C-alpha cells in the first residue's frame, strides 16, 4: 500500500495518475484534509483517507497498512517543519517502511530561500527516524514562471530580481512521473538523495528572448531591487509573508542556488526532461 499526501494538489495528484498508469492494480491511499477536498479523486481507483499534518492520530490512522509514503512538502507557511515532523513520527509508529520526500534543490540551512531550512530539518528528521528514505530535491517549477513573469507580454518587460544568474527550471509533471518511478521500484532507491532538475539552466534574459521569439513581441528583462519586487507583489494584493517568501526565491536565484543541472531526472524518466523552451512554447504560442 502506498500513501500519497497532498493528494488533491498538483504534484500529489499527478503522481497518483502516473502510478496508476504504470500499474492499474497498485493500491493507493490518498490523504486529503476533508471529504470535500477528496471529491475530485472519486473517479480514481484510490482509497481516500482524511487526515491533517497537525492531527497526529489522523496521520497514524491514515498510515495503517502503508508500506511506502510519499510525503509531499506542505505549502502551509509558519509551521511547515512541525507538520512534516508529525508525519514522519506517525509513519514510524505505523510501521511505514519507506518515506519519499519532496525537498528543494541543494537543500542548505544557509540558503537565501526562507523555506529551505524547513526542508533541511525534515531531511534530518527522516534520516534520524531509521525509516528507509528517498529524498527528491526538486528544482524550481517551470509551472510557476507565467505568474512570475506576469503581464510581460502586454508591458514588454519582465520585472524580476534574479540578476542575470542562470536558473534550472523543470516541469511539475516530470517531477511527478519521477516520483512514480521511484515509488514503483522503491528497493532500488533506498536511502538515496536525488537532485531533480531539467537538462539546462537559463537566465531571465534568456527567458525574455525565448518569449520574444515565441510571441513575435519584443520582451526585455529588467532586473529590479528585491525591495521593489516585494512592493510590487504586495501592490498586487498578496500578503506580506508571501511577498517575503517570493522575494527570498529571487534572492536565492540571484546567488546561484538554482544554477545546477543534474542527470538524475533524465535517468529516472528514461528520456530527456521537458526543456524550458518547450514549456514556454506550450504557454505562449496559444
State each model region's role.
Residues 144-150, 182-193, 259, 286:
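Glycine/proline-rich active-site loop of Rossmann-fold NAD(P)-dependent oxidoreductases
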Amino acid at each position: 500500500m502506498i500513501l500519497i499526501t497532498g493528494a488533491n494538489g498538483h504534484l500529489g495528484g499527478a503522481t497518483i495518475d502516473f502510478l496508476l498508469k504504470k500499474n492499474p492494480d497498485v493500491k493507493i491511499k490518498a490523504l486529503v484534509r476533508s471529504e470535500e477536498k477528496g471529491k475530485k479523486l472519486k473517479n480514481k481507483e484510490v482509497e481516500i483517507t482524511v487526515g491533517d499534518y497537525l492531527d497526529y492520530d489522523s496521520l497514524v490512522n491514515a498510515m495503517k497498512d502503508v508500506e511506502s509514503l510519499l510525503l509531499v512538502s506542505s505549502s502551509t507557511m509558519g509551521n511547515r517543519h512541525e507538520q512534516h515532523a508529525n508525519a514522519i513520527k506517525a509513519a514510524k509508529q505505523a510501521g511505514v517502511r519507506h518515506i519519499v520526500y519532496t525537498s528543494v534543490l541543494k537543500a542548505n540551512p544557509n540558503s537565501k530561500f526562507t523555506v529551505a531550512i524547513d526542508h533541511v530539518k525534515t531531511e534530518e528528521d527522516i534520516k534520524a527516524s531509521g525509516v528507509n528514505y528517498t529524498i527528491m530535491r526538486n528544482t524550481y517549477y517551470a509551472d510557476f514562471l507565467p505568474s512570475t513573469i506576469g503581464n510581460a507580454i502586454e508591458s514588454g518587460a519582465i520585472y524580476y530580481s534574479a540578476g542575470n544568474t542562470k536558473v534550472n527550471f523543470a516541469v511539475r509533471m516530470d517531477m511527478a512521473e519521477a516520483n512514480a518511478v521511484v515509488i514503483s521500484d522503491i528497493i532500488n532507491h533506498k536511502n538515496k538523495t536525488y537532485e531533480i532538475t531539467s537538462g539546462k539552466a537559463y537566465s531571465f534574459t534568456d527567458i525574455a528572448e525565448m518569449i520574444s521569439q515565441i510571441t513575435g513581441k519584443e520582451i526585455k528583462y529588467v532586473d529590479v531591487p528585491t525591495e521593489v519586487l516585494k512592493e510590487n507583489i504586495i501592490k498586487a494584493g498578496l500578503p506580506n509573508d508571501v511577498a517575503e517568501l517570493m522575494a527570498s526565491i529571487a534572492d536565492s536565484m540571484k546567488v546561484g542556488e538554482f544554477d545546477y543541472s543534474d542527470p538524475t531526472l533524465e535517468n529516472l524518466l528514461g528520456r530527456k526532461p521537458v526543456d524550458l523552451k518547450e514549456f514556454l512554447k506550450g504557454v505562449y504560442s496559444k
